[in-house]
Amino acid sequence: MTAIIDIHAREILDSRGNPTVEVDVLLEDGSFGRAAVPSGASTGAHEAVELRDGDKARYLGKGVTKAVTAVNSDIAECILGLDAEDQRDIDLAMIELDGTENKSRLGANAILGTSLAVAKAAADARGLPLYSYVGGVSAHVLPVPMMNIINGGEHADNPIDFQEFMIMPVGAPSLAEAVRWGAEVFHTLKKGLHEKGLATAVGDEGGFAPNLASTRDALDFVMASIEKAGFKPGEDMMLALDCAATEFFKNGKYEISGEGLSLSPDAMADYLAALCDAYPIISIEDGMGEDDFEGWAALTAKVGKRVQLVGDDLFVTNPKRLEMGIGKGLANSLLVKVNQIGSLTETLEAVSIAQRNGYTAVMSHRSGETEDATIADLAVATNCGQIKTGSLARSDRLAKYNQLIRIEEELGVSARYAGKTAFGRLGA
């Protein structure tokens, strides 16, 4: 009854107006699943390959008809008739069919869209929400949001080199209240920027990209907004950074050009440690370049016992990269982006490896998103306790927050907001 009888992919647009892949899966009993694939702006060199057409005459080379064709032909032929509840077998069959280390033949976008649509169809067949189908009875922890309210780096045209300045409402009693707190800080920040004559247009992820002078200038604005909104920094709200340091790691130096700094890996670790001393920063993502293992080791040694150090470009949601990093003692947390690895099975494996080794996990969106809210369900399914899905603007970001609000309501008395427990042994 849960055999796959039809698969259909199409080209749709993401939140940046670029093409992406959407896949529909239909089962014998009429159950249905649909999934759309996100896309990143700052991508790690070790990510699985997002297959693009390269035809400059169409969508400026960013079309995905090759990936769509791969789903509708090769992948469909491979998995039609298989049982949608055999997720691992289906994912492994697609990976084997692709035959490359980085999914470059069929495309991670083709494989992932199919993988997630299969899971949704199987959940529909069981009459279960996706978080419950994937996570079982233990799926009841609502994640603390990392809300990206000021943008720099690759996400903005301003002098700030760090990519994201985020707030985390760790003191909220529930997910719904956490969203409210975040929204109130967001609107307070907007008012404060406007009063200073600074830009309040929003970027790809819904955050502001004002022309601020430095990292500390941005952090000061965020701190002031938290306080003006009536919350206590360090108690109600913690701060989080995504440095995206790979983007400004040049010839062995961290070129923080907006501040006129050229730092060695050790000096960069000291720079970040000083920020953690001055502000209530609980999490730093990609504080070092993706292959600067010595820098990561230095940063982990300096602040790893008190700050969550999240590997995004470092680990690219890849179980092999993650195991390498764990073995070297790099970072203490995994950023989870389903399209970095390209299948649900491998994503769940990476989260499991992280959690078994005492690393936290943070479910994450990409800068190019759609209305698909799958990652909200996966955050609850994996009990990872944290989610990074943008600011409090743009419906492609709010779709995830709204889905989490629904899940919390649906879980009722069994729902638990992770709050200050989200950081494992670090605490907040």
Curated annotation (Swiss-Prot):
InterPro entries tied to this protein: Enolase, Enolase-like_C_sf, Enolase-like_N, Enolase_C, Enolase_CS, Enolase_N
Cofactor list: Mg(2+)
Leading EC class: lyase
Name of the protein in its database record: Enolase
Organism, scientific name: Novosphingobium aromaticivorans (strain ATCC 700278 / DSM 12444 / CCUG 56034 / CIP 105152 / NBRC 16084 / F199)
Positions annotated as active site in the UniProt record: E205, K337
Gene Ontology terms: cellular component: cell surface; extracellular region; phosphopyruvate hydratase complex
Residue numbers binding (2R)-2-phosphoglycerate: Q163, K337, R366, S367, K388
Compartment list: Cytoplasm; Secreted; Cell surface
Gene: eno
GO molecular function term, any single one: magnesium ion binding
Residues given in the record as Mg(2+) binding sites: D242, E285, D312
GO biological process: glycolytic process
Metabolic or biological pathway, per its Swiss-Prot or TrEMBL entry: Carbohydrate degradation; glycolysis; pyruvate from D-glyceraldehyde 3-phosphate: step 4/5
Catalytic reaction(s) noted: (2R)-2-phosphoglycerate = phosphoenolpyruvate + H2O
